[in-house]
Swiss-Prot record:
InterPro entries per UniProt: Ribosomal_uL16, Ribosomal_uL16_bact-type, Ribosomal_uL16_CS, Ribosomal_uL16_dom, Ribosomal_uL16_sf
Keywords noted in UniProt: Ribonucleoprotein, Ribosomal protein, RNA-binding, rRNA-binding, tRNA-binding
CDD domains to which the protein is assigned, alphabetical: Ribosomal_L16_L10e (cd01433)
GO aspect biological process, one term: translation
Protein name listed in UniProt: Large ribosomal subunit protein uL16
GO cellular component, one term: cytosolic large ribosomal subunit
Family: Belongs to the universal ribosomal protein uL16 family.
Assembly notes: Part of the 50S ribosomal subunit.
Protein role: Binds 23S rRNA and is also seen to make contacts with the A and possibly P site tRNAs.
Single GO MF annotation: structural constituent of ribosome
SUPFAM superfamilies to which the protein is assigned, alphabetical: Ribosomal protein L16p/L10e (SSF54686)
Signal peptide: none
Organism, scientific name: Stenotrophomonas maltophilia (strain K279a)
Length: 137
């Protein structure tokens, strides 16, 4: 699963996830892309599950790029622990997603195959997405 090798700080503030994606909002590497249309967080498990579903559907054809990386730690306190006593331990990692963010890209397959692969992948993700094609080469 994806997670940073090392970070400057173990835990981060909750923060706010608002605004639009200013970077990574166009198909840059492949021919087709899966673009987020809503705010949300993608866990490392969700990213991996969607990657597997795309890989299984296209089999050996095509090349895929993952355009998001889970670099934010999410903490959780153990069950039946009283409030206070500091912040909990890191439970999992997430990538914060804004509308317009490209999540996956693919090339080397037909549009029908790419559409179906991304449809299967979108079912594994917690944000709404749309299928986009590259406009200019």
């Amino acid at each position: 699963m994806l997670q940073p090798k090392r970070t400057k700080y173990r835990k981060v503030h909750k923060g706010r996830n608002d605004g639009l994606s200013w970077s990574a909002n166009a198909v840059s590497f492949g021919e087709y892309g899966l673009k987020a249309t809503a705010h949300g967080q993608l866990t490392a498990r969700q990213i991996e599950a969607a990657r597997r579903s795309i890989s299984r559907y296209v089999k050996r054809g095509g090349k895929m790029w993952i355009r998001v990386f889970p670099d934010k730690p999410i903490t959780k306190k153990p069950i039946e622990v009283r409030m206070g006593s500091g912040k909990g331990n890191v439970e999992y990692w997430v990538a914060q997603i804004q509308p317009g963010r490209m999540i996956y890209e693919i090339e080397g397959v037909s549009e029908e195959v790419a559409r179906e692969a991304f449809r299967l992948a979108a079912a594994k993700l917690s944000v709404t997405t749309t299928f986009v094609t590259r406009t200019v080469r």
